[in-house]
């Protein structure tokens, strides 16, 4: 057990997460510092479940957590069923500030408990409005979606320039 404790404190904490796979950044938007959790590299049922569970388990007040979910793509005729599987998981979390983008996630949004709903975004540029109009300084925003949704490009813009507006 001493070896495990050593690895935990000296090795694993030094591992840098790959961009888009759970890495965190502090970004500045409209004079607000936002803690961005970037899960935007891709999305599939397992990685989405893991990201939601990890975000939910953070020791942060639930009203400080914002989650933006984009579609999981390339699921073929299983798409609707696999998107619907996430409804029960989202409803079981303490996360109340939920935003979605994309056709499949918009359908999921309609089936969520009323107190989980925040808004459906129609275009990626509305993320700025989400941050400016709804978030406070030091709030947390997790973004998760498939590459083809374009969320990863937007997140890279946020992280690269540190100020979008």
Q: Language-model segments: which ranges?
A:
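ATP-dependent carboxylate-amine ligase
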Residues: 1-165
């Amino acid at each position: 057990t001493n070896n495990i404790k050593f690895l935990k404190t000296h090795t694993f904490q030094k591992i840098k997460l790959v961009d888009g796979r759970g890495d965190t950044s502090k970004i500045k938007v409209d004079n607000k510092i936002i803690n961005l959790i970037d899960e935007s590299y891709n999305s599939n049922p397992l990685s989405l479940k893991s990201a939601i569970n990890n975000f939910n388990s953070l020791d942060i007040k639930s009203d400080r957590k914002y989650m933006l979910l984009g579609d999981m793509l390339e699921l073929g005729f299983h798409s609707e069923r696999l998107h619907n599987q996430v409804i029960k998981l989202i409803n079981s979390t303490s996360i109340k500030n939920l935003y979605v983008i994309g056709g499949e996630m918009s359908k999921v949004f309609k089936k969520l408990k009323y107190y989980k709903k925040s808004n459906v975004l129609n275009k990626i540029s509305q993320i700025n409005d989400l941050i400016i109009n709804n978030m406070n300084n030091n709030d947390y925003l997790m973004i998760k979606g498939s590459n083809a949704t374009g969320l990863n490009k937007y997140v890279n813009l946020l992280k690269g320039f540190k100020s979008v507006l």
